[in-house]
């Protein structure tokens, strides 16, 4: 059984036991449980497709930790102008493990 969920403007295909890195969920403490209610599709013995979401479906996940990703360097340069910018960016994310899919 798997489901397609929407979180943070992105879609994820998940099944029980999967580990995901979602955009930072404020107030999510490690070892706590969260519910993801925007379920777009559930595929098991039969398929349920939402319009836009499946009624009564949810995905239960347990928070592993909150962390920051690797630094990405953004470098802009204009040739022959002695003009350059250097910026760094680190993505904040919440790592979760999928515990249950309720359809």
Swiss-Prot record:
- InterPro entries the record matches: bL21-like (IPR028909), bL21-like_sf (IPR036164), Ribosomal_bL21 (IPR001787), Ribosomal_bL21_CS (IPR018258)
Disulfide bonding pattern of the chain: none
GO CC annotations?
cytoplasm; ribonucleoprotein complex; ribosome
- What domain of life does the UniProt record list for this protein's source? Bacteria
Sorted alphabetically, which keywords does the UniProt record give?
Answer: Ribonucleoprotein, Ribosomal protein, RNA-binding, rRNA-binding
Any GO BP annotation: translation
Return the Pfam families for the record: Ribosomal_L21p
List the molecular function annotations (GO) for this entry. rRNA binding; structural constituent of ribosome
Q: How does it assemble?
A: Part of the 50S ribosomal subunit. Contacts protein L20.
Indicate the family of this protein.
Belongs to the bacterial ribosomal protein bL21 family.
Which NCBIfam families does this entry report, sorted A to Z?
L21 (TIGR00061)
Function according to Swiss-Prot or TrEMBL? This protein binds to 23S rRNA in the presence of protein L20.
Q: What is this protein called?
A: Large ribosomal subunit protein bL21
Q: Which organism is it from?
A: Nautilia profundicola (strain ATCC BAA-1463 / DSM 18972 / AmH)
């Amino acid at each position: 059984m798997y489901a397609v969920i929407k979180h943070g403007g992105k879609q994820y295909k998940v099944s029980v036991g999967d580990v995901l890195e979602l955009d930072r969920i404020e107030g999510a403490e490690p070892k706590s449980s969260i519910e993801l209610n925007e379920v777009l599709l559930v595929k098991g013995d039969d398929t349920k497709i939402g319009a836009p979401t499946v009624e009564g479906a949810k995905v239960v996940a347990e928070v592993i930790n909150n962390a920051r990703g690797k630094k990405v360097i953004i470098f802009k340069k204009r040739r022959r102008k002695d003009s350059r910018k250097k910026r760094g960016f680190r993505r904040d994310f919440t790592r979760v493990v999928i515990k249950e899919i309720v359809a």
